[in-house]
Amino acid sequence: MLRSVWNFLKRHKKKCIFLGTVLGGVYILGKYGQKKIREIQEREAAEYIAQARRQYHFESNQRTCNMTVLSMLPTLREALMQQLNSESLTALLKNRPSNKLEIWEDLKIISFTRSTVAVYSTCMLVVLLRVQLNIIGGYIYLDNAAVGKNGTTILAPPDVQQQYLSSIQHLLGDGLTELITVIKQAVQKVLGSVSLKHSLSLLDLEQKLKEIRNLVEQHKSSSWINKDGSKPLLCHYMMPDEETPLAVQACGLSPRDITTIKLLNETRDMLESPDFSTVLNTCLNRGFSRLLDNMAEFFRPTEQDLQHGNSMNSLSSVSLPLAKIIPIVNGQIHSVCSETPSHFVQDLLTMEQVKDFAANVYEAFSTPQQLEK
């Protein structure tokens, strides 16, 4: 039996060698294919887990953004009410002073300035914090992902995070003061000559606010210039025009300072981007629309108007003397800068454009390949 097998192999030696080679190759290829399939499956599973982890971290970061905005609104409201103190003027009016008309004129300017600044500063706060917390959130994600790896350097240690995030104080301090000055000048120009007895409809009020916005957003006080020669929208109120105090120091910068300066420069780049201007402008449009919605209830037609056939679909038929509109406008700050989620703040926090922009910022700073560019 063995001899016949041996003779068969000798007679078909080349065929047997070829067959053995083919079978061996098939076996090796099969093993190699199985190994590659396992590697692909493991890589896909790792990528899925990493993506899920990053998505969870992103969503958690957005909740932190929302909570931070709400926690800072009382500080913003207090700063506004301190610099634009209309309450002291209303208290004076209760005493029937001889210069009542002069006080009413001051109250007119301060009331419109305060509500307009409230809309601008709240929108800026929402979008700026989205940028800052998603930049730092991206770095924190990379730091967490690198835990346990040898030779890795922490990108954003806690002291750097604190130093970087403290830059928001510019918006609540010098930036807010400058914004108040510019808006007050615009309000004076648009409404200064309007008599307290002059009646305005809601549409008239909307037009006046548009005129104020045009003056504010075309103001040329900023030295910020984009690479294409254009001026970024309102950026100098959120970050100072000049170099940061840290960067001014020619020497003696600590590694923490250098990292903070890098984060601030990256923030500047984001603020100068067309996407940021688009999102901020969208927020401002929504904010002023919501402000008008809040005041619309005071422009409802009365029963007498309805009986006389003045029931138009719009509220253009209902007009109020400016003196009656001033208290309405003056009280809007409590709705705009409310730490209890009002319709105004809720609208800004849940806007799809804001969410998409936040996702893009987080994506850019939570991907190592992007940071290396």
Curated annotation (Swiss-Prot):
It is a multi-pass membrane protein. It is found in: Peroxisome membrane. It comes from the Eukaryota. One of its GO terms (biological process) is protein import into peroxisome membrane. Found in all examined tissues. GO terms for molecular function: lipid binding; protein-macromolecule adaptor activity. Residues 37-116 are peroxisomal. Residues 1-15, 141-373 are cytoplasmic. Residues 1-45 are annotated as: Targeting to peroxisomes. The chain crosses the membrane at residues 16-36, 117-140. Changing residue 134 to D: Abolishes binding to PEX19 without affecting targeting to peroxisomes. GO terms for cellular component: endoplasmic reticulum; membrane; nucleoplasm; peroxisomal membrane; peroxisome; protein-containing complex; protein-lipid complex. It holds the Pfam family Peroxin-3. Residues 120-136 are annotated as: Interaction with PEX19. The keyword Transmembrane helix applies. InterPro entries: Peroxin-3. The keyword Transmembrane helix applies. Keywords: Disease variant, Membrane, Peroxisome, Peroxisome biogenesis, Peroxisome biogenesis disorder, Transmembrane, Transmembrane helix, Zellweger syndrome. Belongs to the peroxin-3 family. Involved in peroxisome biosynthesis and integrity. Assembles membrane vesicles before the matrix proteins are translocated. As a docking factor for PEX19, is necessary for the import of peroxisomal membrane proteins in the peroxisomes. It is linked to Peroxisome biogenesis disorder complementation group 12: A peroxisomal disorder arising from a failure of protein import into the peroxisomal membrane or matrix. The peroxisome biogenesis disorders (PBD group) are genetically heterogeneous with at least 14 distinct genetic groups as concluded from complementation studies. Include disorders are: Zellweger syndrome (ZWS), neonatal adrenoleukodystrophy (NALD), infantile Refsum disease (IRD), and classical rhizomelic chondrodysplasia punctata (RCDP). Interacts with PEX19. This is Peroxisomal biogenesis factor 3. It comes from Homo sapiens.
